[in-house]
């Protein structure tokens, strides 16, 4: 139903990106090779493994295009009251400039909605 990817790096699976940013791992191995069609969630991108190497826009571009559907946004390591609005702005900007397709986001929405229906979870 759901799987969580971490920010760990395994150069046997992807020589360039950690799991949470890797299209090769998430879309290639997990979805295509293993046939997983559920929701992929990733750990908090504000964790140092990501935030020390990527800015908000780059990290969300990579995660979404890799196939991540849902994010843990803890915002507790270096609390920023504007973190969530910055993430939303970054994603909107990435869609506007064509770096993330609307269809990619719709795919995630469909998977999340399907999971919510399966477990009778309501809300918007």
Regions found by a protein language model. Give the residues of each.
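Second-shell residues forming the walls of enzyme active-site clefts
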Residues: 1-93, 97-100
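Mid-to-C-terminal alpha-helical segments outside catalytic/metal-binding sites
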Residues: 96-124
């Amino acid at each position: 139903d759901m799987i969580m990817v971490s920010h760990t790096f395994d150069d046997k699976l992807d020589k360039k990106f950690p799991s949470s940013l890797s299209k090769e791992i998430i879309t290639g191995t997990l979805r295509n090779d293993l046939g997983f069609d559920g929701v992929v969630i990733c750990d908090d991108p504000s964790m140092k493994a990501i935030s020390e190497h990527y800015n908000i826009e780059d990290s969300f571009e990579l995660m979404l295009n890799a196939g991540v559907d849902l994010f843990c946004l803890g915002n507790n390591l270096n609390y920023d009251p504007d973190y969530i609005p910055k993430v939303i702005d970054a994603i909107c900007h990435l869609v506007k400039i064509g770096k993330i397709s609307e269809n990619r986001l719709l795919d995630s929405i469909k998977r999340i909605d399907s999971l919510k229906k399966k477990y009778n979870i309501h809300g918007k």
